Regions:
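Shared catalytic-loop signature of beta/alpha-barrel
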Residues: 1-89, 93
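C-terminal extensions of enzymes
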Residues: 75-120
């Protein structure tokens, strides 16, 4: 489809496509064909944050689609902070990695399963 010029925009969702690496690959393939990328989110605040960071890393990212009802609703119930949307523009979180930090109340739940990886 790309080689035949049948695609005007490529839109994908980080969770559905397979994660950060797969999204970067898809974005690079689209860029090689001068196709702009639009990232989609309707799967939660971590996916939203991943998409924001991907948008910052892709020179061909042009738009980001998310559900305002989720962003202003339950997304903020799960995380300490979500990337700020201001006048149609979004900024990535500051901090290590993606900058994501779950609210303590979710970590303290009796049925929470916490796994820490210390890869070096």
């Amino acid at each position: 489809f790309l080689q035949k010029g049948l695609i005007d925009y490529m839109m994908f969702d980080p969770i559905w496509l397979g994660g950060i690496t797969e999204c970067l690959k898809a974005g690079a393939i689209a860029d090689a064909h001068q196709i702009p990328v639009s990232i989609h989110d309707c799967n939660g605040p971590v996916n939203f944050t991943v998409g924001v960071n991907l948008s910052m890393a892709m020179t061909n990212a042009c738009t980001y689609e998310t559900a305002r009802g989720f962003y202003y609703g339950w997304y903020k119930e799960l995380l300490e902070d979500v990337p700020l949307i201001d006048h149609g523009f979004v900024s990535p979180l500051k901090g290590d990695g993606l900058g994501v930090k779950l609210k303590d109340k979710w970590l303290e739940e009796s049925n929470s399963n916490i796994v820490i990886s210390n890869l070096k």
